[in-house]
């Protein structure tokens, strides 16, 4: 199991390294993309980078599927282990119930046994039965010790299996936590790509808007230039006409002088000249009207110039507003930096709290392990001490029984002797009564015999009292032994309850540990969210500042160009337009070259990613084979657990059999003692 876990960890580390490399590549790509945006590439490089990022999701999806399969298998194993635990608990409860039932049945059978059937058995048979029962007791004790040893070994093996399961569970939790982190990172990258898309769209919109405004202004400027040209042409025509009219007026004046000289001679011609003068006056009026129109057009041009000056002032005001916005963006950036510093401080505090919590967890683990070890040691010591005490008590009881049996045999011999002496004395008394009264010596003999009889009766009474006291002592010893047995059972039950309570405490501690882990995960997520918010704020501030600076620079450049165009002549504007066309052609060529390079790099990356996909598929196949091996090992472990359960059941059966044998032996001893007492009482009655 440990080797398989190490292999899984190595493979997961490799996959994490590959993902980190991809992430680092994309992070290094972003500033190049921004530089290309600032130089003139703007949207195309971002589109190419996004197309490159679109090749990553299949790898990530396969990795997530593989992790989900592993998590499902872990949940299946957890459920299976829980079911096994429940089955073990049910088996233990059934064994206890059967043990109690057998004990009650044996006690009832022993109580139902009839007494007084074997009163006339011999003492030798009783001794043999006692010896056989003692041997059975010794064998039962040996089997009990052997069963306890096997039970301890089985419990140790179960503890080792539980430790392995806990280690596997902790590693699975670590895998899940790392998977969550990776998913969060992927979500962050996706959000960043979306934001870059939005930023690119905004930049494109601003560029389109700026181009539209530039084209509109150029159109207006061209219209104004056309109007100026037309006005200048009209002025030139009007000036030429005025010159012509002045020349005509001079010629007319000369002609008038000539005509004044020739008035008298050319009266007929005066009417024609008057007509011509009227025509000339009408033409002059027309020229004057044209001059008025030209003056009005000049006034219109002056008003247009004033409007342009107003627009320039408005643009200057907008520039000042944009500068104010720039200062506001800088202040916002400063605020975001302060927020970042506060977030870093909170993060450090959270890390310190996490370290303290980890130290507290380690302390709790140590204390719990010490408590469990102390409880186990105490339980073992108490069991061993109680076992030794019971063994000592059993040996003492055996010694006392042997001494009491010896005393009983001696006392029975004395009683038999006293009975024989009594019979002999009674026979002698009968002989004396038959023969009649004899000498005083015979009378003395009778008195001595009578005193002997009295002494024998006294000794008989003393022996009976001693027998009663011995029987009472045996009863007290039996009562004490039963009380001590009950106390030992109570102690064992108390120890079992203590063990169960400690197990519950361990479960409660594990739950608290899980809660603390969840709290730590939540805190880490909050810190990551704060970091993300701070980074997003920084990025937004930087983007705003860069966009504002770019806009200001573009606007300033545009205003300068407009002013220069208004001041310069048409030639400069044509030259600038040619330069702009050449620059656009150059940028278009550059974009084409960059797109070719990016397509080649994308194809190379796609080929490398395909090779990595094939490698990862091989890794997944290896992982599947390892999972099959793990499943086989789990099946083997289940078989071992079943074998241990069978061994435990056998041990419990042997323990129950040993207890039944001990109970039967104790009952047989009690029956034998009762039979002996009854035999003694019957003998006494017969003698009386």
Swiss-Prot record:
Keyword Nucleotide-binding: no
Protein name (record): Sodium channel and clathrin linker 1
GO MF annotation list: clathrin binding; sodium channel regulator activity
Residue positions, PTM N-acetylalanine: 2
Subcellular location: Cytoplasm, Cytoskeleton, Microtubule organizing center, Centrosome, Centriole
Cellular component GO terms held in the UniProt record: centriole; centrosome; ciliary basal body; ciliary transition fiber; clathrin complex; cytosol
Major location (coarse): cytoplasm
Function: Adapter protein that links SCN10A to clathrin. Regulates SCN10A channel activity, possibly by promoting channel internalization.
Domain of life: Eukaryota
Subunit structure: Interacts with SCN10A and clathrin. Identified in a complex containing SCN10A, clathrin and SCLT1.
